[in-house]
Amino acid sequence: MKTVVNSWNEWDPLKHVIVGRADDCHIPPEEPALDAKVPEDSDMRGQWGRRPQETIDRANELLDNFASLLEKRGIRVDRPTPIDFSKPATTPDFHTDSQFGCMPPRDVLLTVGSEILEATMSYRCRWFEYLCYRPLMEKYWEEDPNFRHEAAPKPRLTDRDYRADYLSEKIGIEKRLKWTAEKFFVTTEEEPLFDAADVLRFGKDLVVQHGFTTNQRGIEWLRRHFPDHRVHAVNFPGDPYPIHIDATFTPIRPGLILNNPQRRLPGEQREIFYKNDWEIIDAAQPAHNTPPPLCYSSVWLSMNVLVLDPKTVCVEKSEVYQAEQMDKLGMEVVEVELRDAYAFGGGLHCCTADVYRESSMEDYFSTLSG
């Protein structure tokens, strides 16, 4: 299959995708951005180092099976090249004793049209993660003359990028919710920061979550970088750990979005969707009461689905309520076992990154042009 980089939204027919790997994945050491994400009662507090080999093997088995399933449906699948994540991440501004992994390419790579943009990232342990994808980027650049490989300015990630008061006391859930409602996050506005997984693509419009991993300067950088797009900042006050939008707000097809019922989009931010005949409905409840062991993510990875086309969606096999909801919405559900890989970086949307969808830059919000 000839390489063509082209993807403008989250739902048009998927023809080429990157699926991550779990090789050598580490629980990184404590650092400012990471500590604020890990709840006080989490089993990950105080733990760091290489994940147990049997869990790595199991995660890779599931990721390989997912890749094979996609290939059997006629979708080209590429995989990253893991680096040695046991090595420290060191720059003139910071040092952390190990890195993370390359299971979730969605965090690092943002595909907009014929461009793949490497995000800044906001964790020190993930500063060099882009290297896992460089062999693929080089290959695409050679094979597709229209492909644009871009990288956002690498942040310094000094202590000035983080609020020390996020870590200075044992912070209860009520205080966290108050802070996030006030858009008071662990990251400051020292320099532009964004993770690619905070961005959803709606043709001419990009919806970007302001939270722990993406700040306002990062959103403004995206606005200037994509001058032909409209960039909309959103936030979800019900989320005490707002990191990455794709377990909170999930477009399924033109006109339909699932919203996490515990993290509803504020009323004034819904107007652009309602005025353009988009329906926002509550996602089904997760099938699990707790996340898997040693997992950063919440139980709401249930709604972290991968849409293959406007009528077909991949849902994690154990998430029976989400699958039932998708079925009632008229979607063909493809069950994919992945829960034992969640701890390595997320769900079905997280562990993939688009290369090619049969799509174009359509205007889905024409009543609010400009």
PLM features per residue range, with description:
Residues 1-370:
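The feature marks the mature, well-folded catalytic cores of soluble enzymes
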